[in-house]
From Swiss-Prot:
Organism of provenance: Pelobacter propionicus (strain DSM 2379 / NBRC 103807 / OttBd1)
Lineage: Bacteria, Pseudomonadati, Thermodesulfobacteriota, Desulfuromonadia, Desulfuromonadales
Enzyme type, top EC level: transferase
GO molecular function terms attached to this record: 4 iron, 4 sulfur cluster binding; metal ion binding; rRNA (adenine(2503)-C2-)-methyltransferase activity; rRNA binding; tRNA (adenine(37)-C2)-methyltransferase activity; tRNA binding
Pfam families: Radical_SAM, RlmN_N
UniProt-listed Enzyme Commission number(s): 2.1.1.192
Name recorded for this polypeptide: Dual-specificity RNA methyltransferase RlmN
Amino acid sequence: MTEKTDLKNLTLPALEQFLRGQGKERFRATQVFKWIYQHDARSFQEMTNISKDLRAELEAKAYISNLEPEAVEVGGDGTRKYLFGLEDGNSVESVLIPDEGRNTLCISSQVGCAMGCAFCLTGTFRLTRNLTTAEIVNQIMAVRRDVEIRNIVMMGMGEPLHNLDNVIPAIHIMIDGNGLQLSNRRVTVSTCGLAPEMERLGRELPNVNLAVSLNATTDELRDRIMPINRRYPLKELLSACREFPLPGRRKVTFEYVMLGGLNDTLEDAKRLLRLTSDIPNKVNLIPFNEFQGCEFRSPTRAAIDAFHKYLIDRHVTVITRDSRGSDISAACGQLKGKLDAARQPTE
């Protein structure tokens, strides 16, 4: 028996090819695509402007996958963490960061992560597998049933550039005018520093935003806290940032997790400025969110303010991120912190 095709794994051109293989006209693909993403159709029977015969054929050869949250935790600041159970028993999390008129959804790209960043709780769990295109898109579809989403950041569980074969089609679906209709200016892909994959991302999706998790200004420290630096050290990473095709006046976002006593001094701020001054950039300072068993600590308020002021005074665009969702383990670096506990049955 032939395995059915999940249509949410297909971009619009791929869906056109799929239906062409069934002898169908090209415009049928656009009809089906719109039903899936603009009407949230979960069955072919809902597609009332398509003939019964075509619906029956689709039913025989394809299906429309779906994700429903197993649990939703709401933080004191309104942040929501969604726990999604996957068909194979694995789980991933997404985080909705509410902001009046411009809600941001942080989505996952992998189950676990292979990068092993020392300050990230998700990184303490080994990579189990990549998410499919459908599983990435379905996180957005599920949360969008609750609230309007304006921004997508691929900063959840996993390293997006380690799964480009599924991430790139998912983003094409996000920004397709017949799909999720998100502006490419509102989609940001984050990486810990896979330099060759940055080149591929820029080539295949030149209009999305790039965020680079930098977190250190010397190879010595970055080697210690981010093992990927041993393969792609700062010089190679920053060269890839310079080559990334930024449209218009957009900038690379450098994410900088501030670790108390390690990378939060004025000397670090000075080195950061020297390293990045020839790259159009903005800096997100992220005070470290402590978790049980971690070896690092949060920076002091004084250290955060001094670092921020040094960069601002030198005309760097810099934002110190609030620790949104930390009370529900939904803050940066905390995903999967309460996953197992959340899934345990209560007596």
